[in-house]
Amino acid sequence: MSAAAVLAVVAAAVAALAAAASGYELTKNGTVITYDRRSLIIDGHREIFFSGSIHYPRSPPDTWPDLISKAKEGGLNVIESYVFWNGHEPEQGVYNFEGRYDLIKFFKLIQEKEMYAIVRIGPFVQAEWNHGGLPYWLREIPDIIFRTNNEPFKKYMKQFVTLIVNKLKEAKLFASQGGPIILAQIENEYQHLEVAFKEAGTKYINWAAKMAIATNTGVPWIMCKQTKAPGEVIPTCNGRHCGDTWPGPADKKKPLLWTENWTAQYRVFGDPPSQRSAEDIAFSVARFFSVGGTMANYYMYHGGTNFGRNGAAFVMPRYYDEAPLDEFGLYKEPKWGHLRDLHHALRHCKKALLWGNPSVQPLGKLYEARVFEMKEKNVCVAFLSNHNTKEDGTVTFRGQKYFVARRSISILADCKTVVFSTQHVNSQHNQRTFHFADQTVQDNVWEMYSEEKIPRYSKTSIRTQRPLEQYNQTKDKTDYLWYTTSFRLETDDLPYRKEVKPVLEVSSHGHAIVAFVNDAFVGCGHGTKINKAFTMEKAMDLKVGVNHVAILSSTLGLMDSGSYLEHRMAGVYTVTIRGLNTGTLDLTTNGWGHVVGLDGERRRVHSEQGMGAVAWKPGKDNQPLTWYRRRFDPPSGTDPVVIDLTPMGKGFLFVNGEGLGRYWVSYHHALGKPSQYLYHVPRSLLRPKGNTLMFFEEEGGKPDAIMILTVKRDNICTFMTEKNPAHVRWSWESKDSQPKAVAGAGAGAGGLKPTAVLSCPTKKTIQSVVFASYGNPLGICGNYTVGSCHAPRTKEVVEKACIGRKTCSLVVSSEVYGGDVHCPGTTGTLAVQAKCSKRPPRSAATAQ
C-alpha cells in the first residue's frame, strides 16, 4: 500500500475516531443514569468510559477548550475534576467563581465538546492542594474537628456541598437536566481515616452519603477508596493497578469504577525525577477492563500548575508534568498516543465487554486468557496476559500461537486477531526542548527593593514569652512569620579562642527558616515533605552587650492529608545558643516578638500600584530578603513560555502581579539538582510589551543569569518492531460488532504490517531526519544510536517518505529498508528521529 493511501486511511480513521470517541448520548430533556454490576447505564444503555482529570484552577481558562479537545482526541469521553472549597470560599461567606475558579464555564465547555463529566465535590479533596481544599477559616470555628461526626464541621460541609450542587443545578449541568455530569463524588479516600475516628468516623461517612443523596442531583454518587460505601453510593478505586489490588465493591450490584489511575508520581521539593511508562499505564487499564471494569480515570490527564500558594506542603508548582498532556498542555508522546490506541482497541470490544459471559483460562505459569463472549452472536474478546516481568513468551489460545511480551496484555478483539499490545507502542514519541528567547534580553536591567530593617523585639506588637505557632498567626495569608528576641552577654560569656564560635540552634515544626544575628545572615534550614520538623545549627558571631536574633520562618503550604488537620503546626518552637563559656543559653522563654508577613507583602510591591510606591535601586547579586524586578517583552510566536530560575535560591515568583508559585532551586535532590527550576508563564498573562518579572528572594542569587525560554515538542520519533500489531486506529474497523481489517491498510505479502506514522505539530512540517536505523537500534527519542545490525538505506528511505510533509507513514519491514534478517541480534526494529519546524517563507527558501 502506498504512503499516500496509508495517510488517507489514517485521516479517515482519525476523523471517525474523533466523531465516535465520546459515545455521547445525553439529551437536552434529561438523561437517566443508573448502574448494574457491569457498568453505568445511560438511558438504558451500558457504556464504557475513559476519563481524564483536568483541574480547572490549575490551568488558565483560555487553555480549557484546547485541553478538553485534546483529551477527546485522545479517546476520552469523560473529564473529571475536583471542586476546591478554599478557592471558591477563601473567606467565610465570600465567594469566588471567576477566572480560574469559573467551574460553571469549565463544565459547560465539556458539554460543548459532547463529553461526559464527573464532579468530585469532596469537599475535602486532598489533591496535593493547600489544606486539601479546606479553607483556613474553617480551623477557627469553635470546637471543630475536620472529617468526623462533628456538628460544626458537618454544618459547614453541608452548606458548601449544597451551594455547589445548587449552582450546578442552576446551570442545568447534571445529566438528569440534560447536562454532562454523570457522577458526583462526596468525601475522598476516607476509609483509612475512618479507623482513626472509629465509631465517629463510621457515623460521619454514613451521614455524608445521606446528605449527598438528599441533594437530589439525579445522578449516582461515588466515594473513592471506600470499599463499603453506604447505601446506593458507589465505591471506587484509586491506585496504579486496581485490576490486581481491588476486588471491587462489596455490593455486587455496583460496577467497578476507577477514579484515580496515577499517570506519574506527583513531586515535592526535594524529589528526584520520576516517571511512569506508557506501557505500564496501558497494562493497568487493559487489566482493569479484563477483570470487569468499565470506567477508568487518569489522574492526571493534564496536571497544570499550582499557581500562587495553592500547592500543599512542599508540593512544587509543576503538577503531574508526566501526564499525557504535560504542564503546558503539549502532547507527551508516546503516553498520549499509546493510551489513545488502547481506548480505540477497547471500543472495538465494547459489546463483548458489556454483555459477554466472562471466563478465565490459564495458559501456563504467569499466563492467562480472560474472555468475554456471546457465542450466540459470535461476539468475543480475549485478553492474553503475561505476568512475567522478565521474559517474553508464546502461548496457545484456541489452537493458535500468540507472542506475548513480558508483563503485557494482548487484546484479541474477535478472540483471534491481536489489535493491541500494551507493551508494543505504535504511536510516535517526542522530545521536549527549551529555547532561549533572544528578544527577552533587551533592557535586561534588574532593580531591587530590600526588605525594611530586620525586625527587633522592641519594635514588634505581638509579644509572648515563647515563640508562637505559625499557622495561627499567618492564617494562610502569607508564608512568612518573623520571630525575634534580644539578650545580653558579658565578656565572660564569649569564647576566649577565636576558632571557637557560639552555635545558634533552632528547632522548628517546619517548614524552613532563614536566621539573622545582629542583622547579619547566619544561615538557612528546612525540613522535608516526610519530616517537616527539623533543627538548624549554625555558627555565628556574638558581641558583648545586647544581641539580636531574628528568624524568618516560612511555610510551603498547609498539609493536605491525614486526621486532625486542624491541629497541624508549623514554625519555631525552641531556640538555644550553645558554645558559650557559661554553658548553653536557652532563649525559648526569653520573650519573643512576632511580625506577620513581609514588608513588601504589606506594601503589595508585586502590584503595579505597590511597586510605584517604593524606592527601587540597581540590582545586586546575592542579596537575601530582597525583591527583584525587570521588564521584558514576550517571546514571539505561540509556544509556551518558561522562566529558568536556576541561579536563584528560594522565594516566590510573580509576572504582571500574578503569583506563579514558590521556587526553591537551592534545595537539591539526591541527584544533585533542584526538583524544579523552570516555571510556566501562561501566555494569557503577558502583554504585547513591558511585562514585569518580579520575585522575592529569601537567600540570595544572581538575577542577571535568569533566562526566559520557550517550549517545543518538535523532535518526533518512532521506535517500532516487526512484532508490533498493525495499528489499531486505521488498520481495523468495527463491523457487525467485530473488528474487520480496513481494505488494504498496511497490507503486504505477509498481510497487515505494523506501520509507523510521524506527525508534526500544527503548521509545521518535517524538515530533517536526524536519525534513522533499521535493525537493532538502541536508545530513546533524542538519543538513539545504531546497533550491531543496521540497514544503510534506512535514512534515505525515510527522508524520501517524510521530508517536507506534515505526516508520513513508514512500514516496519526489512524489505523496505534492505535489512539483513540473518544479522545476529537483529530485532527488526525501526528507529527514526525527525525535526519539525515551520516552512521558511517562499522568498527565503528561494534565496537559499
UniProtKB/Swiss-Prot annotation:
Catalytic activity: Hydrolysis of terminal non-reducing beta-D-galactose residues in beta-D-galactosides
Keyword tags: Apoplast, Glycoprotein, Glycosidase, Hydrolase, Secreted, Signal
Any one GO BP annotation for this protein: galactose catabolic process
PROSITE patterns named among the record's database cross-references: GLYCOSYL_HYDROL_F35, SUEL_LECTIN
Enzyme class: hydrolase
Cellular-component GO terms for this entry: apoplast; plant-type cell wall; vacuole
GO MF annotation list: beta-galactosidase activity; carbohydrate binding
Active site location: 189, 260
EC code: 3.2.1.23
Residue span(s) of domain SUEL-type lectin: 750-837
PANTHER family: BETA-GALACTOSIDASE RELATED
Family note: Belongs to the glycosyl hydrolase 35 family.
Descriptive protein name: Beta-galactosidase 11
Originating species: Oryza sativa subsp. japonica (Rice)
